[in-house]
Amino acid sequence: MSLTGLPDIRKKIGQFHHLRIYKQILSLQGNFARLNYFLGDVFPANLRSASVSVFFEVRLGPRIPDCIVLLKSVDAKDEFAFHCYFFEFKTTLGKSTMQSVHHNCIHQAQYLQGLRQLQQSISFLDQYLIADEVSWNVVPVICFFRQWGLKLDFFKKFSGKTKRLSFSFIRDLFARSQDGAVQSLLSIPNYTNFRRACQKHTDLYRKRCRKAPKSVLTKTSGENRSRASRQVAKNAPKNRIRRTAKKDAKRQ
């Protein structure tokens, strides 16, 4: 099954939850332990003191990975000067597992699409290889989040690839190739305003019901009152109706 066959509303909901994931990552950027936990503990412990840079929806040729986390190692024993993690996020209504990826056609399509995205995004960097530059460890990761509560259900971390790249050039490439609209949304500090802006960005409006014409409303209200009166009379006890009728007859 191809994801292009999904209803547009499902795609828009997925985009909305992607923005929520990005916002959460930004809020945890300064806390290595919490950020690592949120993403499945994919970062090794020796990077605890590394400086962290985060980029979202970076256009790399034909592909746009969801998130790139760049860590500058300060460990003298580390064979890599930089660790670059490419993340592809998938959101699901129900729980996702390795088994569901094999048997659920939608999860499987999401997984395969994510793999292609990661593979082609990382391969794009090959044109910038420089023989005498420092070594990078470039690692692809795919994460499945449940939409309710943004719970990480399942992730897969693949083997890293060693590349020799210029830090200043690649960092600037990532920074200037980010989606400008997404950056503007993520800069909104208030969460309520951020959520509303995300709904607008993804076209997920809470549409209000249109008001009916006054004539229709008046007629409907009158009909409802008449129906209510008939219902009360119908439900009234018969003996009470009879006593009331006798009293009226005596008065006459």
Swiss-Prot record:
Induction info: Expressed late in the infection cycle.
Record localization: Virion; Host cytoplasm; Host nucleus, Host nucleolus; Host Golgi apparatus
One Pfam family this sequence matches: Herpes_UL24
Biased composition (Basic residues): 237-252
Species assigned in the record: Human herpesvirus 6A (strain Uganda-1102)
Primary gene name: U49
Role, per record: May participate in nuclear egress of viral particles. Plays a role in the dispersal of several host nucleolar proteins including NCL/nucleolin and NPM1. Since deletion of host NCL/nucleolin negatively impact on nuclear egress, UL24 supposedly acts on this process through its effect on host nucleoli.
InterPro entries linked: Herpes_UL24
The keyword Ligase appears for this protein: no
Signal sequence coordinates: none
Ranges where the record places region Disordered: 215-252
Family of this protein: Belongs to the herpesviridae UL24 family.
Major place of residence: virion
Keywords per UniProt: Host cytoplasm, Host Golgi apparatus, Host nucleus, Late protein, Virion
Protein name, entry field: Protein UL24 homolog
